[in-house]
Amino acid sequence: MVQGPNTHRNLDDSPAGPLLILSPCAGTPTRSPAAPDAPDFRLPCHFGRPTRKRGPTTPPLSSPGKLCATGPRRVYSVTVCCGNCGKELTFAVKTSSTSLLGFEHLLNSDLDLLCPRCESRERHGKR
């Protein structure tokens, strides 16, 4: 339901998908041939807040240049809304672009990530 002053616009009441921003972190070295950059995914947050892309994050140290069956692995910064309160959660993942697309599909269809506060409430049965 949309609340606010009377307007002459017809607003869509259906919620949009979750916020999902997947982008490669800057300065990630790889030992394999250069792969084309994965696209920067921007989907609207279902809580109606505008999306804001943050700067590159410093990825955690790990074994460099690993290759997996689906191609070279790179570090990506992921920003998604909490499934309960809508707070932005940002974390880094290291994967191939093919696996990243599968992760995007999972986040858009069946998986809700929770912030620490909402996770604690769910664990203790509070809503």
Curated annotation (Swiss-Prot):
Q: Tell me what this protein is called.
A: Protein E7
Q: Name one GO cellular component term.
A: host cell cytoplasm
Per the entry, what this protein does is: Plays a role in viral genome replication by driving entry of quiescent cells into the cell cycle. Stimulation of progression from G1 to S phase allows the virus to efficiently use the cellular DNA replicating machinery to achieve viral genome replication. E7 protein has both transforming and trans-activating activities. Induces the disassembly of the E2F1 transcription factor from RB1, with subsequent transcriptional activation of E2F1-regulated S-phase genes. Interferes with host histone deacetylation mediated by HDAC1 and HDAC2, leading to transcription activation.
Give positions of region: E7 terminal domain.
Answer: 2-56
Return one Gene Ontology term, BP aspect: symbiont-mediated suppression of host type I interferon-mediated signaling pathway
Family named by the database record: Belongs to the papillomaviridae E7 protein family.
Record carries keyword Metal-binding:
yes
